[in-house]
Amino acid sequence: MKIINIGVLAHVDAGKTTLTESLLYNSGAITELGSVDKGTTRTDNTLLERQRGITIQTGITSFQWENTKVNIIDTPGHMDFLAEVYRSLSVLDGAILLISAKDGVQAQTRILFHALRKMGIPTIFFINKIDQNGIDLSTVYQDIKEKLSAEIVIKQKVELYPNMCVTNFTESEQWDTVIEGNDDLLEKYMSGKSLEALELEQEESIRFQNCSLFPLYHGSAKSNIGIDNLIEVITNKFYSSTHRGPSELCGNVFKIEYTKKRQRLAYIRLYSGVLHLRDSVRVSEKEKIKVTEMYTSINGELCKIDRAYSGEIVILQNEFLKLNSVLGDTKLLPQRKKIENPHPLLQTTVEPSKPEQREMLLDALLEISDSDPLLRYYVDSTTHEIILSFLGKVQMEVISALLQEKYHVEIELKEPTVIYMERPLKNAEYTIHIEVPPNPFWASIGLSVSPLPLGSGMQYESSVSLGYLNQSFQNAVMEGIRYGCEQGLYGWNVTDCKICFKYGLYYSPVSTPADFRMLTPIVLEQAFRKAGTELLEPYLSFKVYAPQEYLSRAYNDAPKYCANIVNTQLKNNEVIIIGEIPARCIQDYRNDLTFFTNGLSVCLAELKGYQVTTGEPVCQTRRLNSRIDKVRYMFNKIT
């Protein structure tokens, strides 16, 4: 049986969950349609998803049509959950990008399409909700050509009156774009030679698989228009990116999930081989795990299975598998382009509404961060506060709702702040000698620090010979440096800095690596105090797409938000403004753009790097370390 994995992607409220329900219903996988409004769909499982009518976590279901099994990945549609989208894209054989006939191409549509093209995933456009009043498909086509790609093949004609129907074009009506994109075919056509349908179909298929041509279909998921045709298209156009024939096992973990009973599930896409129940499988060329239970989706339901074949998505109950772990032969994993996960830019303090639920909250955050690497947290050793870092305010709302719904913990969140970093201002050196008070450690250490250009990251080198100070002591110094760089003079991580281990002395046999590990961050702090540090804040590169009449306002308002305009371009009826902006200002700038353009603007942003902050220094409370803080205090007092 052929197995293909497809993604359903769209902007918020374009109808992707409803489309999934219609595909399941029309294929016979389910006997009754679920409803987003009633909260009865197969793929929106959390209370927040049902209440908001949006998808937050990746949902997986399936149907069978003739000799093909189709696994459907119903992905999120909000910017704060793009990491969930990106993790899912890597397992897809193809994608359906939904566009609402009423709303056209939205900001999120552009972001998702960019990701699909970057990762080389064949994509079909599906214009949904064509049965709504006031629809002008020619405007939607133009919107797609201007904002996504001009290389579309409209495969159907839509008759709105007297009875709405969708019919396939005849061959002669759909080949223009295919011919125009191939010089040989165009020359043959212009010379009057006949073109065989087979060579046109082959050309379309090649360009479709190469993501340089995008077939376009129509329908209404809610009214069940065009769904049967879409099922035929899915099963015939998409190919499985798997190794055919006998081969070693290879699979990749793309999702971790915890059930309400706290069972830990790992979702795995198999790319080659066969996975059997009770198999012992090597993970990422390291330890082995034993397959004790295995599930997959069959006609919309999770079912136990005893074997799974190449192309399948399987679910294992396992405590050790991590996101991106590879089962079996790592060399057989397809080499797809990767999209970097967005970098958490905000942090806040969280506490349970009921103090007695603190341990429950920490246990819950451990599970949530295990399944979502963009959520990070730590407990401040000074204040004992729980600090969360995350992407955006919607993600923060989702975490709050998830904690309440699944873990029965209500929380209180403080206003989020931007995550800063630090860099030394100048070169400096500092040495602490053995047996010289107040040094209590059996070690002498000398370190130098030097600022590096922005974006360089951390560099380390040792001038102390391994012949004198062996590897275990050298490793201890590196560990101490890593720890010391976690908190600069303002309490933030230190970056863009070169640190050199210039001098070391030990007494045998009393000195231990622990002495060097403990002393290193104290020496490093004194070097930073001599050098001074400056505060760096995250900057985003952004692109604003807006109607041309709003150019002046968008351009002139940028300095109010500390934005620097780098370039402006005119394309079709739009202006594209390219620039840089502090992360702390992006949300206000977006809100302003949305307001004065009446919602017609799109602002895309991603982390560019860190720059010296222009505002007042923002301090973060230093985390305590009982073993070295007394010594730190003594050195700070004498310097």
Swiss-Prot record:
Binding annotation for GTP: 10-17, 74-78, 128-131
Domain tr-type G: 1-242
Keyword RNA-binding: no
UniProt KW Protein biosynthesis keyword: yes
GO term, biological process aspect, one: ribosome disassembly
Keywords for the protein's UniProt record, in alphabetical order: Antibiotic resistance, GTP-binding, Nucleotide-binding, Protein biosynthesis
InterPro entries, A to Z: EF-G-like_DII, EFG_II, EFG_III/V, EFG_V-like, G_TR_CS, P-loop_NTPase, Ribosomal_Su5_D2-typ_SF, Ribsml_uS5_D2-typ_fold_subgr
GO molecular function: GTP binding; GTPase activity
PROSITE patterns per the UniProt record, alphabetical: G_TR_1, G_TR_2
NCBIfam families, alphabetized: small_GTP (TIGR00231), tet_protect (NF012153), tet_protect_M (NF012155), tet_protect_M_W (NF033148)
Entry function: Abolishes the inhibitory effect of tetracyclin on protein synthesis by a non-covalent modification of the ribosomes.
Similarity comment text for this entry: Belongs to the TRAFAC class translation factor GTPase superfamily. Classic translation factor GTPase family. TetM/TetO subfamily.
Protein name per UniProt: Tetracycline resistance protein TetM
Species of the source: Staphylococcus aureus (strain Mu50 / ATCC 700699)
